[in-house]
Amino acid sequence: MLRLCLAFCVAFVGLHMPTALAQTTSLQGSPGPTVAGWIESATFPDYGITLNAKLDTGADSSSLGVTGLDRFKRDGKTWYRFTLTGMDGKTVTIEQQTNRTARIMRAEVEDTRRPIVQLKICLAGQVAVTDFTLTDRSDRRTALLVGRRFLSSRILVDSGRTHLFPQPCEDGK
């Protein structure tokens, strides 16, 4: 009797294991993180700018490629002015107050400090205000690198696919 019960339990678990695994790996439409490709379109809805983004699980923070980065003081506080250029060529100049910087350590060059700003981003249907370091990414494939701080608990990256979300957000917000 015990063997029969054990055999039934093993068979039952075996039949239902794929369902349980599918739920924990969170396929599109199920609760939990969204699956996205390693390159996706991302929108900054407050500015109407869309960029290609590299989703990089090896990077801790997110980095935004800008031009004309300028530090200045306004009312005794540190501000940054920078220009963001979308895939369609549209440009917008943004001014944001911040006192925060990130120390960037790379093996081939000396450590640098980059300003950190907070911007609202929409990526793979996920909208959030997140931190971005500002830098020149003109020598990179994408102007935007999205790191683990944004991806964690929101997006799982399929490293074999790209552009699973042609529209970053359904309603652009």
Name the predicted role of every residue range:
Residues 1-2:
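N-terminal secretory signal peptides that target proteins for export/translocation
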Residues 5-16:
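Bacterial N-terminal signal peptides
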Residues 21-173:
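Pepsin/retropepsin-fold aspartyl endopeptidases
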